[in-house]
């Protein structure tokens, strides 16, 4: 170090230039003693009795003075070069130590303060949690006291204590119901007591998850693709034929395969088309067939034609929807039937199957309406249906036997007796090629697997539906093969919707104690399952919206 800087440093230290340090008159022990003696010779001023705070401050000041004295003594023993180097590297040691002590004291105080605040906060939370939660808002109508008539309800009569309680307010009725519940349960159960359970770590985690759920407004759970069993969510829509009311029996109800249109026909000789919107269902047009009470009407597979038959005629009417022409087919070459009533259209639109008398089934070309071939069973035909791929025909006889035919060869592939059936009435095949349902006169519906019907001579049904007590005259699978509709025209309200594959009946249809369906004659589902329609003997085509299916 240069001599000038060294001498300047020593001079500044001794002159008291360093802040926060008392000036020293010189080096060595003699000046220090002189300084102390000079302090003793100063006259003492009269002071009041020291308080606890002033005593603590005086003790700290004395401690600081002793540290300074020891530090100065040590610094005097160090070489000047070492003292200068420490000052350059560490700064003023005295200031740094004082600042460090001050920071330590302040941090300790903040730590105690924060702990105290946290304890106060926890106590406040405990007190707040014990308080009863108040409602977010209060409805003025709820505050008005409403009187409940106790005598008009048999359940409320049981909780009346005397005749004077024929009318009670809502609050008193609520208290009375609570008392009855507690009496039946033997006290208040744990789940009914607010705050009775202590929160565990799992409860805290679930609460955190709930908080996370409340941070978003999107959908967390997507709609299930499969239809749940038990309750079928549905809405009663305006009748399909509301704009053309009639009192004649409805014989056929069918949805158009490609357009949002429903067809309604009946014994009043009319075929009507309606636009399906679920609200007004406006009429598109009506076709009147003179002296032709319609037994059955059906769309072609492509939806371009409507076929209709009557109860006492061998004429088959074909209505061309594109051209707007009505074409009667008076005679089919090779067909010797006196009447043409029951018929089926193949799903691929290639064939037309007509059920005749004496057990004959006649297969016609849908395009030319010419006879291709005939098939015969033992006994009379009760009902027939095509498989979903149009390669097989299922014929159900009145004797309870089921015949499986190959369409191309028109040969019988298999034949079996419907289990427990003495007289067959209806048959239907599912759209996915999995099930065959047979409805008998006893009201039993047997559901079979189609593979077992082809391979076994005595197949066992998957499930026997026994919810009806009269003959099952109508069967219909929905497009997704999740619902099987069964109905009987022999009894009012005799309709059930069966869930598949559980084979359980939906409990909410039909609505209990509401005679709105009457005697159901025909049923159908819309192409994608969004609507369900049925016609009754009173001339009403009732329609329901199935909420599980978003499309028509």
UniProtKB/Swiss-Prot annotation:
Composition skew (Low complexity), residue ranges: 43-58
Location of the protein in the cell: Nucleus, Nucleolus
Extent of Basic and acidic residues compositional bias: 72-81
Cross-link Glycyl lysine isopeptide (Lys-Gly) (interchain with G-Cter in SUMO2) residue location(s): 78, 178, 197, 513
Keyword Lipoprotein: no
Post-translational modification Phosphoserine, affected residues: 114-115, 118, 201-202, 206
Entry-linked InterPro entries: Utp18, WD40/YVTN_repeat-like_dom_sf, WD40_repeat_dom_sf, WD40_rpt
Main subcellular location: nucleus
Gene Ontology CC, one term: small-subunit processome
Spans of repeat WD: 245-284, 289-329, 376-415, 417-458, 467-508, 515-551
Gene Ontology biological process terms in this record: ribosomal small subunit biogenesis; rRNA processing
UniProt KW keywords: Isopeptide bond, Nucleus, Phosphoprotein, Repeat, rRNA processing, Ubl conjugation, WD repeat
Residue ranges, annotated region (Disordered): 1-81, 104-143, 183-214
Keyword presence, Ion transport: no
Biased composition, class Acidic residues, residue ranges: 203-212
SMART domains: WD40
Modification sites for Phosphothreonine: 200, 217
Family named by the database record: Belongs to the WD repeat UTP18 family.
Oligomeric form and interacting partners: Part of the small subunit (SSU) processome, composed of more than 70 proteins and the RNA chaperone small nucleolar RNA (snoRNA) U3.
Free-text function comment from the UniProt entry: Part of the small subunit (SSU) processome, first precursor of the small eukaryotic ribosomal subunit. During the assembly of the SSU processome in the nucleolus, many ribosome biogenesis factors, an RNA chaperone and ribosomal proteins associate with the nascent pre-rRNA and work in concert to generate RNA folding, modifications, rearrangements and cleavage as well as targeted degradation of pre-ribosomal RNA by the RNA exosome. Involved in nucleolar processing of pre-18S ribosomal RNA.
The protein's name in its UniProt record: U3 small nucleolar RNA-associated protein 18 homolog
Gene that this sequence comes from: Utp18
């Amino acid at each position: 170090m240069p001599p000038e800087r060294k001498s300047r440093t020593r001079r500044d230290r001794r002159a008291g230039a360093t802040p926060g340090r008392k000036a020293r008159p010189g080096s060595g022990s003699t000046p220090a003693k002189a300084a102390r003696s000079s302090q003793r010779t100063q006259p003492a001023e009269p002071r009041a009795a020291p308080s606890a705070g002033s005593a603590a401050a005086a003790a700290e000041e004395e401690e600081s003075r002793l540290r300074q004295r020891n530090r100065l003594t040590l610094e005097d023993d160090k070489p000047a070069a070492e003292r200068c180097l420490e000052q350059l590297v560490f700064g003023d040691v005295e200031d740094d130590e004082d600042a460090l002590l001050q920071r330590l004291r302040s941090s300790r105080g903040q730590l105690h303060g924060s702990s105290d605040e946290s304890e106060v906060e926890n106590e406040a939370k405990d007190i707040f949690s014990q308080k009863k939660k108040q409602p977010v808002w209060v409805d003025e109508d709820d505050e008005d006291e409403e009187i409940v008539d106790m005598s008009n309800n048999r359940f409320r009569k049981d909780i009346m204590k005397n005749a004077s309680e024929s009318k009670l307010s809502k609050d008193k009725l609520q208290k009375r119901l609570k008392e009855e519940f507690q009496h039946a349960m033997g006290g208040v159960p744990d789940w009914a007591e607010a705050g009775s359970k202590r929160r565990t770590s799992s409860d805290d985690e679930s609460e955190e998850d709930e908080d996370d759920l409340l941070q978003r407004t999107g959908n967390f759970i997507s709609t299930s693709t499969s239809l749940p069993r038990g309750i079928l969510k549905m809405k009663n829509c305006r009748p399909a034929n509301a704009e053309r009311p009639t009192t004649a029996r409805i014989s056929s109800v069918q949805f158009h395969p490609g357009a949002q249109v429903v067809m309604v026909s009946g014994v009043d000789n009319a075929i009507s088309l309606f636009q399906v919107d679920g609200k007004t269902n406006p009429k598109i047009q009506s076709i009147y067939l003179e002296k032709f009470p319609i037994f059955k009407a059906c769309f072609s597979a492509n939806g371009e034609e409507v076929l209709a038959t009557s109860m006492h005629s061998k004429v088959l009417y074909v209505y061309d929807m594109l051209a707007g022409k009505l074409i009667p087919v008076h005679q089919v070459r090779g067909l010797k039937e006196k009447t043409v009533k029951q018929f089926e259209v193949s799903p691929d639109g290639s064939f037309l199957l007509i059920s005749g008398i004496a057990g004959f089934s006649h297969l016609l070309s849908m395009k030319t309406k010419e006879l291709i071939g005939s098939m015969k069973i033992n006994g009379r035909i009760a009902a027939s249906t095509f498989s979903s791929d149009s390669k097989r025909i299922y014929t159900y006889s009145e004797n309870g036997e089921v015949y499986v035919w190959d369409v191309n060869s028109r040969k019988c592939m298999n034949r079996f007796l419907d289990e427990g059936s003495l007289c067959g009435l209806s048959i239907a095949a599912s759209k996915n090629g999995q099930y065959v349902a047979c409805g008998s006169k006893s009201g039993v519906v047997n559901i079979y697997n189609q593979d077992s019907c082809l391979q076994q001579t005595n197949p066992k049904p998957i499930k026997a539906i026994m919810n009806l007590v009269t003959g099952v005259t109508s069967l219909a699978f929905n497009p997704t093969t999740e619902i099987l509709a069964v109905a009987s025209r022999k009894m009012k309200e005799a309709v059930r919707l069966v869930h598949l594959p559980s084979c359980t009946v939906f409990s909410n249809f039909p609505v209990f104690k509401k005679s709105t369906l009457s005697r159901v004659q025909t049923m159908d589902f819309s192409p994608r399952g969004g609507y369900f329609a049925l016609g009754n003997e009173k001339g009403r085509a009732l329609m329901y919206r199935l909420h599980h299916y978003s499309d028509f």
